[in-house]
């Protein structure tokens, strides 16, 4: 299991350890997250992360894209270092990390499975709200002209993807998540977030 945190691997590792069973648990702070974060942790719409995101845009790249690249390199390293011939990898992304994990799972040539905790169901939903508290660097510029998160989730498929307690544009639990998934066309196993914190079998919504 490889945890891709929302804001800090060290602070969020306990959320997944009990669900790991006999799996080895790894965690990574991608660029600008956790140990590599520039400035204090916490919401700051125009802080260091926004500045880094803006610099990448001026260079014709994206912070999200660079984080996906980072994660794919970590996945590659873990596979190279694995001693068991039957080694399989499960990505677990939370919040901002859930978006990165979803893209990385899609691009992974070994078809890693992915569990998303507090992921957005749709970036279109962000545009429909008066206020969105997700960081600007969590979305690709011009993405909605081509696809949205339900398309990404559909490409992964329910065999590889599970979503635990999706978040709204304000980064709070989606009310009536099952109905919202149906409305947005999200096809994935939908489960309660406490299933991860508590371990054991997840209760379906």
Residues of each region from the PLM?
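Hydrophobic beta-strand segments of well-ordered beta-sheets in folded domains
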Residues: 1, 24, 88-90, 112-115, ...
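Acidic, Ser/Thr-rich peripheral helices and adjacent loops at domain boundaries
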Residues: 41-52, 130-143, 180-195
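Serine-hydrolase catalytic core
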Residues: 103-109, 123, 145-205
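Active-site loop/turn elements of alpha/beta-hydrolase fold enzymes
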Residues: 30-32, 116-119, 166
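Composition- and surface-driven signal marking solvent-exposed, interaction-prone regions
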Residues: 1-2, 12-18, 28-31, 39-42, ...
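Short, contiguous acidic/charged loop-to-helix segments that flank catalytic cores in large enzymes
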Residues: 10, 58-66, 90, 139-144, ...
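Primarily recognizes the serine-hydrolase "nucleophile elbow" in alpha/beta-hydrolase
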Residues: 74-146, 150-155
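Cap/lid segment of the alpha/beta-hydrolase catalytic domain
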Residues: 3-81, 85, 123-133
């Amino acid at each position: 299991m490889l945890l891709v945190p929302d804001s800090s691997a060290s602070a969020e590792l306990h959320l997944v350890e009990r669900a790991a069973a006999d799996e080895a648990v790894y965690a990574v702070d991608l660029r600008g997250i956790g140990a590599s974060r520039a400035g204090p942790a916490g919401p700051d719409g125009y802080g260091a992360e926004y500045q880094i995101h803006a610099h990448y845009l001026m260079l014709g790249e994206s912070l999200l894209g660079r984080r996906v690249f980072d994660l794919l390199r970590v996945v590659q390293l873990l596979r190279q270092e694995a001693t068991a011939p039957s080694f399989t990898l499960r990505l677990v992304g939370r919040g901002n990390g859930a978006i990165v994990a979803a893209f990385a799972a899609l691009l992974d040539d070994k078809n890693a499975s992915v569990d998303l905790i507090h992921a957005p169901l749709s970036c279109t939903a962000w545009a429909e709200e008066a206020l969105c508290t997700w960081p600007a660097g969590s979305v690709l510029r011009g993405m909605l002209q081509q696809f949205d998160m339900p398309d990404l989730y559909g490409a992964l498929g329910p065999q590889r993807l599970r979503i635990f307690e999706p978040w709204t544009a304000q980064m709070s639990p989606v009310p009536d998540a099952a109905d919202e998934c149906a409305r947005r066309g999200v096809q994935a196993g939908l489960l309660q977030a406490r299933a991860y914190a508590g371990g054991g079998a997840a209760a379906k919504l």
